[in-house]
Swiss-Prot record:
Belongs to the RbfA family. Keywords: Cytoplasm, Ribosome biogenesis. GO terms for cellular component: cytosol. The lineage of its organism: Bacteria, Pseudomonadati, Pseudomonadota, Betaproteobacteria, Burkholderiales. Transmembrane segments: none annotated. InterPro entries: KH_dom-like_a/b, RbfA, RbfA_dom_sf. Its main location: cytoplasm. This is Ribosome-binding factor A. It comes from the Bacteria. GO terms for molecular function: ribosomal small subunit binding. It holds the Pfam family RBFA. GO terms for biological process: maturation of SSU-rRNA. It comes from Acidovorax ebreus (strain TPSY). Monomer. Binds 30S ribosomal subunits, but not 50S ribosomal subunits or 70S ribosomes.
Amino acid sequence: MAAKKSSSPNRGFKVADQIQRDLTELIRDLKDPRIGMVTLQGVEVTPDYAHAKVFFSVLIGDGEASEEALNQAGGFLRNGLFKRLHIHTVPTLHFVYDRTTEKAADMNALIARAVASRSKDDDAA
């Protein structure tokens, strides 16, 4: 017997997007001082909706401390999602600190230094 296909192939993306929007509001209401200015970058939900990886970056604050605090608050946040989402299974949340913005800033700094040293070399020649 063939596996039953989902009636809406984009449903997983829609659920992930709604989770991201709702979590943004719920995290804003958290009072934990370890959580800095967090920006949710994306959410990946497993096909059975049992787990969700939530990728975030931090503008101000410590990323690792924020990750620990968010994972500790995961049950509270999941309960908040349960009240907002109208799906049978609300996923267990796994927060992952996304270092992409840090790496991009480091790469930009390296490029700027290389360009500056090259222009100094051209001026000396």
